[in-house]
Amino acid sequence: MKLIFEKGTPGRHCHLLPDCDVPVHQIGVGRKEKLNLPELSENEISRHYTGLAGRAHGVNNGFYPLGSCTMKYNPKVNEEAASLEGFAGIHPLQPEHTVRGALRVFDLAEQYLCEITGMDAMTFQPAAGAHGEFTGLLLIKAYHHSRGDEKRTKIIVPDSAHGTNPASATMAGYSVVSIPSREDGCVDLDKLKEAVGEDTAGLMLTNPNTVGLFDKNILEITRIVHDGGGLCYYDGANLNAVSGIVRPGDMGFDVIHLNLHKTFSTPHGGGGPGSGPVGCKEFLRPFLPGFMVKGPQSIGSVKMFYGNFGVVVKALAYIMTLGREGIPEASSNAVLNANYMMNKLSDLYQMAYNETCMHEFVMTLEDLKHDINVSAMDIAKALLDYGIHPPTMYFPLIVHEALMVEPTETESKETLDEAIEVFRSIYEKAKADPQSLHQAPVKTPVRRLDEVTAARKPVLRYIGE
């Protein structure tokens, strides 16, 4: 399929525009080269992007078990709510009395999310998860500085953490202390005690953790950090496993970010902007980014205006639709689906941890790689030929040849059974003809790419002939 830059004919246009009826303002800056834009009809443009859409894979056209990403179905009624003229047609600089409905959306969303998480206050400014992490860490830093405690310069992060955790801590000006996990994938309490000291600003943790297990020592973990004078930050990436069942605030966490585009069903992965609201306990409220008014201790705005408002509307519609009973039921079904798949595959594929998982599970293909030279990459690519999006590959880093599978609660048993059969048939094919998997995928519009060259010599813009 040609790039859109390779299509068209000079002089062809979509629309005829009237002559400009206002004076032309000369800005005194001119291009050195002609602007190389394609010239196509509307029909050609429509066909081009419709063709691209047909090649894409999303939750609307196939199973999408991308671990740690919660690629659940996005209810279309939420899109209708966000498209209402009173929400879609407003401007953040309108007079306050004309946007009271929008302000009510923020108020309700804050109430419900605080109830779900056990927090006392929330900001919706952060644009997505990592932005939320950065904002939450700035709250922790502002808190310690307000107490004159300038020596707390380190953030503790487990070795199984999302890569954004240490990156966000570094951006916030902290040094990162990584602590190893135990063999069961959970936090090593002895190593944590050794790491906590007078220079500890806080701990960043996901629970359930990145290998899909709930750390039963969570109360002891947060107590150790608090006793050392640090604060506890909850990465909400895996909240979909426990939403409405257990609250991070009750586990001892002081700050949390949520991914509305994961747990609360708003589109992501190319389907729309994210939203990473940050919640906190009452003692951290003064440091939040200002909403209507910025207090003297506020860290200041982290995004223009109020954040991605339309995403908040969709998440609020989701919460109100499911209600107090539906939200924990969704989490329970997410856990049930993950355990069903794990148990149906465990006789062939080696699981990284032989325990009941939460919302996702991790396989290790280390034995296959060693015995027949079939890697996690080969299995993942083969799934594409069956219309299944690959699981997350080679993550978490503490598991060799990892595939992380998260089916989510919105998949039916029939879909899970079909996916299980595909996984099993690929395994048998790998055993019978391992070389064939090195060529996969063979049925997709684009075959296997040279990812090493793409990473080392990326072509980031169209250059032309």
At which residue positions do the language-model features occur?
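General small-molecule cofactor/ligand-binding pocket signal
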Residues: 123, 177-179, 391
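Conserved phosphate/anionic-ligand binding catalytic regions in large, soluble enzymes, centered on
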Residues: 57-77, 125-133, 264-279, 307-311, ...
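Non-catalytic terminal extensions of PLP-dependent enzymes
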Residues: 1-121, 246, 301-302, 319-465
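Long, K/E/R/D-enriched contiguous segments that form extended
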Residues: 107-111, 117-120, 125-136, 140
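Mobile "lid/hinge" segments at catalytic clefts and subdomain interfaces of large enzymes
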Residues: 273-342
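Conserved PLP-enzyme active-site core in the AAT-like
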Residues: 101-104, 131-297, 373-374, 401
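Active-site lining segments that contact anionic ligands and/or coordinate catalytic metals
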Residues: 119, 152, 199-201, 227-231, ...
